[in-house]
Design a protein with these regions (language model features):
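Core catalytic alpha/beta fold that binds nucleotide/phospho-ligands
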Residues: 1-232
Length: 232
């Protein structure tokens, strides 16, 4: 598959696809991935990890035109994975049985998906997570969880794009303007331009991507409908 500068591809997939949750998926992963997989205590978490990383490798193989098992990943200083010797940027996120993979060319990208769920102390969570403008939007809403999780996916996506980690002061990352201005590139910090957009996913979930720079073209794909991969 071809990807040009300014384009972004979002792949959606289901992590409970029976064909992928099995021991046969393990040989596709690297030694580092298998080591990480074995650190999970629950078998279901191990299988979810294997399934997710197989999806990521199979989709990326379509763009790199090499076997999925031959893709070499490395980690940035803060743990964000990247592909060695490639101008492709990618990021993935999964919750419950759903996942997203974002792919761009020469532009950093972040993506996040979250399951909407009740919070024990929404006021305290918001106080440490959102700016004053974001909180104003959240608490003016009839259903506070809807904008709250929208903003949380915005934050996760931009944090993953920048690779700064959740230990950053999230209240200083004000993304309130993006709530009403989807796809309009806005300045976030240091005069850098970012594009943030909600992704429509299954009911009960929220998702978003963040792209550094302008977005010229945006496409979504369903992994479960795509049958050709460079697996071996």
């Amino acid at each position: 598959m071809e990807l040009k500068n300014g384009e972004l591809h979002i792949w959606k997939y289901s992590l409970n696809t029976e064909d992928y949750i099995s021991e046969k998926n393990k040989p596709l992963l690297s030694k580092n991935e298998l080591t990480r997989c074995n650190q999970f205590l629950q078998e279901s978490d191990k299988m979810r990890y294997i399934c997710n990383h197989r999806f990521v490798r199979n989709v990326l193989s379509l763009y790199l035109n090499i076997a999925a098992s031959k893709i070499n990943f490395d980690l940035e200083t803060r743990g964000k994975p990247y592909i060695k010797n490639s101008n492709l940027f990618f990021n993935y996120s999964y919750r419950a049985s759903y996942g997203l993979l974002a792919i761009s060319k020469n532009q950093a990208v972040g993506v996040d998906i979250e399951k909407i769920k009740p919070l024990q102390d929404i006021l305290t969570f918001s106080e440490f997570s959102f700016s004053e403008k974001e909180k104003e939007i959240i608490f003016k809403s009839e259903n506070e969880l809807e904008p709250l999780f929208t903003f949380w996916t915005f934050k996760e996506a931009i944090i993953k794009l920048l690779g700064i980690g959740l230990n950053a002061d999230l209240t200083k990352i004000d993304l309130s303007n993006f709530f009403y201005n989807e796809l309009n590139p806005l300045s976030y910090s240091n005069n850098e331009i970012f594009t943030i957009k909600k992704i429509i996913v299954n009911q009960g979930f929220k998702a978003a991507f963040a792209l550094k720079g302008n977005l010229l073209k945006y496409q979504e794909f369903d992994f479960n409908e795509h049958k050709t991969y460079n697996q071996n």
